[in-house]
């Protein structure tokens, strides 16, 4: 295993971590160059300078989509007639198998807060909210205490560091809905409405929280901002081994590996390096059957893809998405039907129910998979699953929930079709008629 020695020059997100993994509170954070970036920005830069810096750095969103952060910031409404603008931190980390944001919030909370302060300064925002997953009880306590610490030290409030910059920061805990990870559903929830996605346009940058210009960024994205402001664009670009994406990324492996965890690594590090050098390989007696690059809502890949660089373009070319870059290893003793069925049950339960394809399609997928799992499937079940994947593909539903939900299913069928076909009942195979239209797969056929 590689022995990581985090330094400020090579590990901007994690070099402040304590060896005992206790929280880095504000006094220790300040001793480790904490809030230096904020002081630099407020004293020597204007908001436009910070936006330009982030755009030039190539920082991409770390929530999964990989959209340019600087470009997203530049889309904020330039209409200064509206003095009220909002910055929202999406900390509603509910993607199964993902835990990177919790890692940052519980260990280095002031890095996130400083990132929000810098982002707010760049966007002329005076109020921010951290929308936290409700189940993150420890993170809630730590963030509340950290916000109060920042207020006491004069980093949050009015006329921060005598600069004329004002910023209030509030913590809001969610009610346990996965769909709040979608930025407009998050906004609806924060307003006290049902957590349904909104139609776009208008985009939040123009019409967001309470109808005001709003920017929504992920925890890890915001945590990258202080180091970029402090050390500059050229330094940040050199951190990466990829020609596609700049900087570093929290990456990890879970599943039946010897050392599951999360590590800050350069973009371009291969999945094999992470699995073998950091996660120490599969447990004794097991070998890798498949893996998901970045959460439950990403397509499965197989062993031959382990040598791909972990960046947005390389993983996309292989037919999946980098997502959160917290990978899940699937071992050879895992039944793919059972695994995918479990994933689809989660996504079916978490559908907001707004659009018909998602509301009706995902439960039907679960029903078919349950039959296949019991080896009671029907002749056309696998074909119907493939058709449902097409029916729930991008552009056919109101948001990206359903398209993401069927990614693991379509890829599992692609690579492990025989396992799914093995779930078809021999008896029903002999006596079977085609399913006409969208209806239950439980039917009787004429003999």
Swiss-Prot record:
Q: Report the Gene3D superfamilies cross-referenced here.
A: 3.10.20.600, 6.10.250.1450, NADH-ubiquinone oxidoreductase 51kDa subunit, NADH-ubiquinone oxidoreductase 51kDa subunit, iron-sulphur binding domain
Q: Which UniProt keywords apply?
A: 4Fe-4S, Flavoprotein, FMN, Iron, Iron-sulfur, Metal-binding, NAD, Quinone, Translocase
Q: Which domain of life is it from?
A: Bacteria
Residue sites binding FMN per the record:
174-221
Its needed co-factors are: [4Fe-4S] cluster; FMN
Name one molecular function that GO assigns to this entry: FMN binding
**Cofactor binding mode and count:** Binds 1 [4Fe-4S] cluster.
- Which reaction(s) are listed as its catalytic activity? a quinone + NADH + 5 H(+)(in) = a quinol + NAD(+) + 4 H(+)(out)
Task: Give me the residues that bind NAD(+), please.
Answer: 61-70
Q: Does the keyword Flavoprotein apply?
A: yes
> Which residues make up the binding site for [4Fe-4S] cluster?
352, 355, 358, 399
UniProt cross-references to InterPro entries, sorted A to Z? NADH-UbQ_OxRdtase_51kDa_CS, NADH-UbQ_OxRdtase_suF, Nuo51_FMN-bd, Nuo51_FMN-bd_sf, Nuop51_4Fe4S-bd, Nuop51_4Fe4S-bd_sf
Give its E.C. classification number: 7.1.1.-
Taking the record's annotation, the residue ranges forming a coiled coil are none
Family (UniProt): Belongs to the complex I 51 kDa subunit family.
Q: How does it assemble?
A: Composed of 13 different subunits. Subunits NuoCD, E, F, and G constitute the peripheral sector of the complex.
Query: What does this protein do, in the record's words?
Result: NDH-1 shuttles electrons from NADH, via FMN and iron-sulfur (Fe-S) centers, to quinones in the respiratory chain. Couples the redox reaction to proton translocation (for every two electrons transferred, four hydrogen ions are translocated across the cytoplasmic membrane), and thus conserves the redox energy in a proton gradient.
This chain belongs to which protein, by name? Answer: NADH-quinone oxidoreductase subunit F
Q: Which organism is it from?
A: Buchnera aphidicola subsp. Schizaphis graminum (strain Sg)
Lineage, broadest ranks: Bacteria, Pseudomonadati, Pseudomonadota, Gammaproteobacteria, Enterobacterales
